[in-house]
Each structure stands twice: as C-alpha cells, then as structure tokens.
Amino acid sequence: MSTTSVIPKHWVDKGPWPIMTTPQGEGQDTNSHYSVFLATDMCHVHNLFIRAMNSVYLQCPYVTDQADIADLLFYTKTLVITIDAHHDSEEKYLFPELAAYTKNPKIMAVNQAQHAAFHGGLEKLGEYCTTTSPADYSSVTFRAMIDSFAPQLFKHLNDEIPTILALKQYPSEDLKTIWTKTEQHIDDVGSFDEMFPLAFGCMDKGFEAGQHKFPPAPFFMEYVVRYWFARKHSGAWRFNPCDMRGNPRQLLFIPTEEDQKP
C-alpha cells in the first residue's frame, strides 16, 4: 500500500538543493531494463546526500551550544566520508568495468571530470569538521565552504542519471553483472555505526507516494540500525531529516514560529 509522507513545514525538500525525481517516479518501468533500475537506485543514494547536505546547511546558523556544534561537525564529517566512499567505488570499480565492457575508455569521462571538480572543496569541508573545535566553529565559514563546491556536486548528482539511462543500449544482464561487482566493494568502506545511521535517517519512505523499496534491506535492518548502530553517536543523528524508520521530521535546530514570538 502506498503512503505519502507528512512533510514538516521547514524541511529539507525545500532546498536549497532540490530532491531529484527518479526514473521510476517519472513512469519508467524498472523491470524494463537494468539501466532504469540502477538509475532509480542511484537517485535514492543521491537524494540522501541532498537531504543530509540541505539539513546541515539550513540548521548550521542556529547551532550554538558546544555539544551541539560537536555533533554537527561529526555528522557533516560522516556525510563527507559517505559521499567519498560512494564516488571512490565508482572510480575504482564501476567506471573501469564499464569502460572495459563497452571498449570505450571515455564512456564515463564527463562524470569523472565532475568528481574532480567538487572533490577538493568536499575534502576541505571534511578537514574543517575534523580539525575545528566547537569553540572555533563559524556557521558563516561552514556555509561558505559548502557553497564553494555545492554547484558542482549537485550538477554531478543530477547529470549522472541520464548517463546511466543511456546504458540501455547494452544488454540488461551484462549491466547487472557489472553493478553487482561494484556492490561487493561498497560495504568494505566506512564504519557501520556512522554510515548506516546517516543513510537510514535520510530516507523518506513516503517519497514519490511510497512506491519505492529502498534501501533493499531486510525489515529487521531498521531495528539493528536504530537500536545498535545509532547508539554510539546518537547526538549526531539529531541532524537527520528523518527518523530511522524513514519518517520526515521537523529539523531540530530551525526556529519554529512559537520560538520567534516575543
């Protein structure tokens, strides 16, 4: 049964960077070719990055307590690591496999160039989050660092989807085999008690009328993440725009209308 999320008044879908519509959401059949399935799944991954980045960008000016700042910096550092891990898996496994299979070494050249365009700025943000003490934190500096690479990052996240859909010219099963090889390496990177809580807390289960089954994990995984992996850094996950069940929630540090009343 389809469900639609109850979206809070001030939420990450309102920007500054818009959530992407999936090919499935546009009416394409994910069973018609693996390129449609893969492009739809890739949209979900990209959307979790967008939701997380929107969340920290919108909330950062209102985070003033030292403990809250420490959690914000940790959360953002985890986001940087997660984006890095995703793109590293593409650079090391997916892109070379596609180049070899298609006998076209430049098939993903545009995407690789886009990675390079935002990588330096993303790394500087990660370094800032790792080396800055809560006492030295500046929301102005924090936002400016995101602004320095965000246009390139979000252009890439959007541009990669039609590139994947263009792989429809190749046999569906061959593309599935290539992606399966890449997936085998994704879980090798990062800490489960960091990446999993961030990912599960940025998935809107009601997105596009609740028609998606993403992430493709067994039902009990939500409980494992919520009650086990999320415990260690629980303060950081307050910046997630959803709870661990995929329900959108009010951004904690955004002032409400009640807060702003004299």
Swiss-Prot record:
Region (Hemerythrin-like): 69-160
Keywords noted in UniProt: Metal-binding
Disulfide bonds: none
Pathway assigned in UniProt: Secondary metabolite biosynthesis
One GO MF term: metal ion binding
One Pfam family cited in the UniProt record for this chain: Hemerythrin
InterPro entries: Dimeric_xanthone_biosynth, Hemerythrin-like
Keyword Metal-binding tagged: yes
Function: Part of the gene cluster that mediates the biosynthesis of the dimeric xanthones cryptosporioptides. The pathway begins with the synthesis of atrochrysone thioester by the polyketide synthase dmx-nrPKS. The atrochrysone carboxyl ACP thioesterase dmxR1 then breaks the thioester bond and releases the atrochrysone carboxylic acid from dmx-nrPKS. Atrochrysone carboxylic acid is decarboxylated by the decarboxylase dmxR15, and oxidized by the anthrone oxygenase dmxR16 to yield emodin. Emodin is then reduced to emodin hydroquinone by the oxidoreductase dmxR7.
Domain notes per entry: The hemerythrin-like domain might act as a cathion-binding domain since it binds iron in haemerythrin, but can bind other metals in related proteins, such as cadmium or magnesium.
Protein's name in the database: Dimeric xanthone biosynthesis cluster protein R11
Species of the source: Cryptosporiopsis sp. (strain 8999)
